[in-house]
């Protein structure tokens, strides 16, 4: 009973869900990539600033 109901609902909805999820995953992947790039760039700039002891001492 429940399985036939699931099949009736899921089969027409399945392509829609998979397409939406693909777009979500692409978005998530792009966002994480952007965040990673920003963080690595931020670390690099902090490392450059940290070379001078005055900055490293006063910035915590």
Curated annotation (Swiss-Prot):
Domain of life of the organism encoding this protein: Eukaryota
Keyword annotations: Membrane, Mitochondrion, Transmembrane, Transmembrane helix
Signal recorded as keyword: no
GO cellular component term, pick one: proton-transporting ATP synthase complex
Protein name listed in UniProt: ATP synthase subunit ATP5MPL, mitochondrial
Entry membrane topology: Single-pass membrane protein
Assembly and oligomerization: Component of an ATP synthase complex composed of ATP5PB, ATP5MC1, ATP5F1E, ATP5PD, ATP5ME, ATP5PF, ATP5MF, MT-ATP6, MT-ATP8, ATP5F1A, ATP5F1B, ATP5F1D, ATP5F1C, ATP5PO, ATP5MG, ATP5MK and ATP5MPL.
Described purpose of this protein according to its UniProt entry: Mitochondrial membrane ATP synthase (F(1)F(0) ATP synthase or Complex V) produces ATP from ADP in the presence of a proton gradient across the membrane which is generated by electron transport complexes of the respiratory chain. F-type ATPases consist of two structural domains, F(1) - containing the extramembraneous catalytic core and F(0) - containing the membrane proton channel, linked together by a central stalk and a peripheral stalk. During catalysis, ATP synthesis in the catalytic domain of F(1) is coupled via a rotary mechanism of the central stalk subunits to proton translocation.
Chief location category: mitochondrion
Compartments where located: Mitochondrion membrane
Native species: Rattus norvegicus (Rat)
